[in-house]
């Protein structure tokens, strides 16, 4: 799926033209309305700066939170302020995303100026992908750039609908990098390819596990979902989380791995807690010795060694989902050890891809984000791409 990119547009093509750029500025705020993490804003800078340097007039569209209609707390005003600081130029802010005020401010833009539209989700038509709303959004622009990978799995007006009215419709640098890493890892990886899948529920990762069993050489499973596999094997799991309706599925996934010659690794020991709390009493036991009344909240030290050995000779690793309840320091060791392991093997040329969601937070928590080859900015979008699904926001872009 090779898409036309913003890099392929020359200054001659776009100088003086109006670019509608879909970004993902859904950043966290504190109670005072200050941005606590501007990673997503920084991630969009390469695309914005490329367009301004080529003389385009840049119109940015983003969602912010989940408003039901206009919500004063979910205006993009703090984002405009932070973006102005990062770009070193004033960003024009509108109070709406369509209509006369927007048209007037866009008409006044000089080449290289940047304007930020108000939260597109103030209109319910955005998530319904309403063609009339998409047409109004597109009316102020000449061409379209999608640089919001995190919403690419949604067919919304600003991610999919507008492409019907604007040409060219191209991928921004962030989307291009996501596709380059995630797709090549699935379609054409350097082998051995290992996938590490964690998280609490098998049900949310079934699609990914099934797809990866077709593609990878080794599959490592951690997190709460391991107890569904253990119970399916007939082991006692105490009070650990189990999805009773997924026991047969767990058996069939193990059988499928065997049949395909994929090395499927589950932890050999676990760290147990007597209740779900950061200060719970804990003990480490082998998986055959889980007593009643205890629940597993992390993988144990032996499992870490087994996983490290399995990862030592890999050339590509995809990691999605933590090994335990890493929000509790007492049960974070397994997740942190995997992060350190990936940082180490990355130094010897292994491509390490963090596939969105909680694993990103885990890698950032231990300060190793800059040592990974690629950290995906999409949670659901990364998962769907790894599952081999078509993402509407990507499919709608022009072919290269």
Swiss-Prot record:
Give the EC number.
2.7.2.3
**Which pathway or pathways does this protein act in?**
Carbohydrate degradation; glycolysis; pyruvate from D-glyceraldehyde 3-phosphate: step 2/5
Where is the protein localized? Answer: Cytoplasm
Catalyses:
(2R)-3-phosphoglycerate + ATP = (2R)-3-phospho-glyceroyl phosphate + ADP
Please tell me whether the keyword Hydrolase is annotated for this protein: no
- Which gene does this sequence derive from? pgk
> GO terms for biological process?
gluconeogenesis; glycolytic process
Q: Kind of enzyme, top EC level?
A: transferase
Residues reported in the UniProt entry to bind substrate? 24-26, 40, 63-66, 121, 154
Assembly, per entry = Monomer.
Q: What is the lineage of its organism?
A: Bacteria, Bacillati, Cyanobacteriota, Cyanophyceae, Nostocales
Q: Which UniProt keywords apply?
A: ATP-binding, Cytoplasm, Glycolysis, Kinase, Nucleotide-binding, Transferase
Instruction: Show the InterPro entries listed in the entry.
Output: Phosphoglycerate_kinase, Phosphoglycerate_kinase_N, Phosphoglycerate_kinase_sf
GO CC, one annotated term = cytosol
**Species of the source:** Trichormus variabilis (strain ATCC 29413 / PCC 7937) (Anabaena variabilis)
Q: Which residues bind ATP?
A: 205, 296, 327, 356-359
Q: By what name is this protein known?
A: Phosphoglycerate kinase
MF annotations from Gene Ontology:
ADP binding; ATP binding; phosphoglycerate kinase activity
Family recorded in the similarity comment: Belongs to the phosphoglycerate kinase family.
- Tell me which SUPFAM superfamilies the record gives: Phosphoglycerate kinase
């Amino acid at each position: 799926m090779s898409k036309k990119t913003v890099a392929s547009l020359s200054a001659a093509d776009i100088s003086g033209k109006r670019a509608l750029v879909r970004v993902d500025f859904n950043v966290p705020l504190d109670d005072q309305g200050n941005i606590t993490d501007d990673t997503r804003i920084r991630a969009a800078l390469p695309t914005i700066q490329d367009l301004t340097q080529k003389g385009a007039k840049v119109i940015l569209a983003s969602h912010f939170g989940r408003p039901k209609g206009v919500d004063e707390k979910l205006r993009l005003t703090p984002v405009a302020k932070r973006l102005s600081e990062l770009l070193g130029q004033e960003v024009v802010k509108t109070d709406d995303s369509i209509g006369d005020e927007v048209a007037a401010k866009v008409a006044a833009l000089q080449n290289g100026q940047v304007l930020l539209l108000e939260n597109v989700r103030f209109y319910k038509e955005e998530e319904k992908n309403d063609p009339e709303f998409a047409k109004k959004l597109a009316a102020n622009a000449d061409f379209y750039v999608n640089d919001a990978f995190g919403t690419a799995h949604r067919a919304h007006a600003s991610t999919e609908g507008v492409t019907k009215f604007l040409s060219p419709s191209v991928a921004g640098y962030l989307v291009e990098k996501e596709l380059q890493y995630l797709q090549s890892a699935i379609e054409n990886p350097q082998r051995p390819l290992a996938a590490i899948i964690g998280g609490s529920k098998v049900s949310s990762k079934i699609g990914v596990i099934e797809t990866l069993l077709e593609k990878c050489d080794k599959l490592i499973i951690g997190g709460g979902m391991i107890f569904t596999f253990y119970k399916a094997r007939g082991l006692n799991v105490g009070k650990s989380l189990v999805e009773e309706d997924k026991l047969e599925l767990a058996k069939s996934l193990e059988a499928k791995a065997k049949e395909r010659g994929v090395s499927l690794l589950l932890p050999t020991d676990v760290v147990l807690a007597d209740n779900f709390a950061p200060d719970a009493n804990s003990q480490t036991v082998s998986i055959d010795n889980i007593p009643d009344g205890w629940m597993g909240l992390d993988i144990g030290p032996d499992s870490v060694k087994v996983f490290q050995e399995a990862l030592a000779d890999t050339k590509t690793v995809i990691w999605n989902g933590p090994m335990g309840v890493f929000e509790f320091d007492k049960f974070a060791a397994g997740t942190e050890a995997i992060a350190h392991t990936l940082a180490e093997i990355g130094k010897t040329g292994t491509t390490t891809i963090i596939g969105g969601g909680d694993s990103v937070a885990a890698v950032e928590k231990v300060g190793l984000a800059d040592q990974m080859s690629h950290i995906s900015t999409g949670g659901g979008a990364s998962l769907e791409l790894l599952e081999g699904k078509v993402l509407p926001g990507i499919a709608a872009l022009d072919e290269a």
